C-alpha cells in the first residue's frame, strides 16, 4: 500500500517562533544601518571603513544578468540585522529559553553530545551558542564565532579577512561585506589534524530577514580539519535572503573538507560566495547538499595556487515546485600538476529547475594539470527541466580535461521490475532516487547521511515547502 504523503506541517524545520530579539534594525539598507551594526559590535575603525566602502560598491554594482530570476528580491524590504540575545553562551543552559527550544527541536545539543568536537549555533544575525572541547584549545585550535575572532584575534583575523573574497568580487559579496554578522572562524595550527567534525548551524526565524554570516577557515601547513554546516528557515509567504561569504586558506600539505547540508524553506533566496586558495600539495573538498530555497545560486570555487594542489566538489541539488537550483563549481588551475574533480548530482520534480553552471580554467603556468567533470541529472516528470552550462578556459596545451554529462528519467522498465516485486510505484521511485544520490550520501558522516536521506524522502513526498 502506498504511503500517505505528509503535509507541510510534517516538515519539522518549517516552524517559526515568536520574535525574541533584543534589537532589530529598520528595514532597508542605508549607511546609518551599517554604522549601527558596527557600533553595536564595538568594532575597530578599520572594519567600519571596510563596511562603508563595501556599501558603496554594492550600490554601484549591477545585479547578475544570468542565473535565476531576482526581480522579486526587494533590498528595501529586508531586515539586515537582528540581535537575538546579549551574549554568545558557552553553556547550553544559559541560552535564552525561547531560542533554546528552537535548537532543541532541531537536535543541536543532542548532536553535540554524540559526535562533534565543537558546535556553533547562529540564530538570525548572531551566534547564540558556541562550545569546543577543551583538548582542542590546548592544541592551539581556534574555533570561534567570527565576531569574537575579530575582537580577540584581530591580527590573525585582519591578515586573512577578505583576502580570498574581496568586497568587489560580486554584488552579493559586497552586500555581505557591508552587513556581515556571525559565522565561524577556524584556525588549525601547523601539523595539527582534527578528525572529529566542527559544526555550525544557521537558523533564520523572522520574516523578511537577511542572514549574512561570514566564515573564515585557515588550515596551516600540514593541518587538517572537517567542518560541517547546516541551514534551515521557517515557511513564510514573503521572501528572506541568505547571502553568506566563505573564505578558506589551505596552506602547503593541508587538508580541509567543508560540508553543507542546506534545507531552506521555499521563500529563501540563497545567494552565496564560497572560495578557497589551495597552496602546494594542499587538498580542498567541498561537499554541498542543496535542498529547498526559492532560488539557490552557489558555485564553490577552488583556486589551485601551488604545485600539486587538489580541489574537488561533490554536490547534490534537488528542485521541486517553484524552485530553481542554479549550482555548480569553479576550478581555477594556476600551478603545474594541479588536479580537480567535479561530481554534480541533480534531481528535479513538479516543475522544478536544476542548472549545473561550472567553470574550469587552466592558466599558462598550469602544465600537467587535469580535471574531471561528471554531471548527472534525474528528472522525475515532464514538467521539470535541467540545464548543463559548462565553461572551460584553456591557456596551455599540456592539460587533461574530461567532461561527461547525463540526463535521465525514471524508466518504465525500472519501475515495472520493482513493482513486480510487490513494491508500490511511489516506493519504487524513491528507491531509484536514493540509489542515484548514494555517491553523495556515502561521503557524509553517518548522522548526516541519515538526515540527508530523510530530507530527500520528504522532498519525494511533496512535504517540504
From Swiss-Prot:
Signal sequence, renumbered to the chain: none
Pfam families per UniProt: SUFBD_core, SufBD_N
InterPro entries found in the cross-reference section: Fe-S_cluster_assembly_SufBD, SUF_FeS_clus_asmbl_SufB, SUF_FeS_clus_asmbl_SufBD_core, SUF_FeS_clus_asmbl_SufBD_sf, SufBD_N
GO biological process, one term: iron-sulfur cluster assembly
Family: Belongs to the iron-sulfur cluster assembly SufBD family.
Annotated protein name in UniProt: Iron-sulfur cluster assembly SufBD family protein SH2035
Protein source organism: Staphylococcus haemolyticus (strain JCSC1435)
Amino acid at each position: 500500500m502506498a504511503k500517505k504523503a505528509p503535509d507541510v506541517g510534517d516538515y519539522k524545520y518549517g516552524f517559526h517562533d515568536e520574535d525574541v530579539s533584543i534589537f532589530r534594525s529598520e528595514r532597508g539598507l542605508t549607511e546609518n544601518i551599517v554604522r549601527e551594526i558596527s557600533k553595536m559590535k564595538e568594532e575597530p575603525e578599520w572594519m567600519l571603513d571596510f563596511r562603508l566602502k563595501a556599501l558603496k560598491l554594492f550600490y554601484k554594482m549591477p545585479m547578475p544578468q544570468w542565473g535565476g530570476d531576482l526581480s522579486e528580491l526587494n533590498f528595501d524590504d529586508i531586515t539586515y540585522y537582528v540581535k537575538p540575545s546579549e551574549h554568545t553562551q558557552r553553556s547550553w543552559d544559559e541560552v535564552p529559553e525561547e531560542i533554546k527550544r528552537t535548537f532543541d527541536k532541531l537536535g543541536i545539543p543532542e548532536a553535540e553530545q554524540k559526535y562533534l568536537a565543537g558546535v556553533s549555533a547562529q540564530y538570525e544575525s548572531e551566534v547564540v551558542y558556541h562550545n569546543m572541547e577543551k583538548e582542542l584549545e590546548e592544541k592551539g585550535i581556534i574555533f570561534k564565532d567570527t565576531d569574537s575572532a575579530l575582537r580577540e584575534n584581530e591580527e590573525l583575523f585582519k591578515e586573512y579577512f577578505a583576502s580570498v573574497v574581496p568586497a568587489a568580487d560580486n554584488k552579493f559579496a559586497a552586500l555581505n561585506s557591508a552587513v556581515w554578522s556571525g559565522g565561524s572562524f577556524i584556525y588549525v595550527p601547523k601539523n595539527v589534524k582534527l578528525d572529529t567534525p566542527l559544526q555550525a548551524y544557521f537558523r533564520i526565524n523572522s520574516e523578511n530577514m537577511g542572514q549574512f554570516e561570514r566564515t573564515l577557515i585557515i588550515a596551516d601547513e600540514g593541518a587538517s580539519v572537517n567542518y560541517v554546516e547546516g541551514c534551515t528557515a521557517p515557511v513564510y509567504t514573503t521572501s528572506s535572503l541568505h547571502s553568506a561569504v566563505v573564505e578558506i586558506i589551505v596552506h602547503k600539505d593541508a587538508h580541509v573538507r567543508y560540508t553543507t547540508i542546506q534545507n531552506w524553506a521555499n521563500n529563501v533566496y540563497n545567494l552565496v560566495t564560497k572560495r578557497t586558495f589551495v597552496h602546494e600539495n594542499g587538498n580542498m573538498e567541498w561537499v554541498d547538499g542543496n535542498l529547498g530555497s526559492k532560488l539557490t545560486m552557489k558555485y564553490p570555487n577552488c583556486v589551485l595556487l601551488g604545485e600539486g594542489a587538489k580541489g574537488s566538489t561533490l554536490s547534490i541539488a534537488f528542485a521541486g515546485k517553484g524552485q530553481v537550483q542554479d549550482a555548480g563549481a569553479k576550478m581555477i588551475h594556476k600551478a603545474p600538476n594541479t588536479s580537480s574533480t567535479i561530481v554534480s548530482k541533480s534531481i528535479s520534480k513538479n516543475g522544478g529547475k536544476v542548472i549545473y553552471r561550472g567553470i574550469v580554467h587552466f592558466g599558462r603556468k598550469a602544465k600537467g594539470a587535469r580535471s574531471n567533470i561528471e554531471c548527472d541529472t534525474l528528472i522525475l516528470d515532464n514538467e521539470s527541466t535541467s540545464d548543463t552550462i559548462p565553461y572551460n578556459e584553456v591557456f596551455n596545451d599540456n592539460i587533461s580535461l574530461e567532461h561527461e554529462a547525463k540526463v535521465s528519467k525514471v524508466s518504465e522498465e525500472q519501475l515495472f521490475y520493482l513493482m513486480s516485486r510487490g513494491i508500490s510505484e511511489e516506493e519504487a521511485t524513491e528507491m531509484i532516487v536514493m540509489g542515484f544520490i548514494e555517491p553523495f550520501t556515502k561521503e557524509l558522516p553517518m548522522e548526516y547521511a541519515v538526515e540527508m536521506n530523510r530530507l530527500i524522502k520528504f522532498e519525494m513526498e511533496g512535504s517540504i515547502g
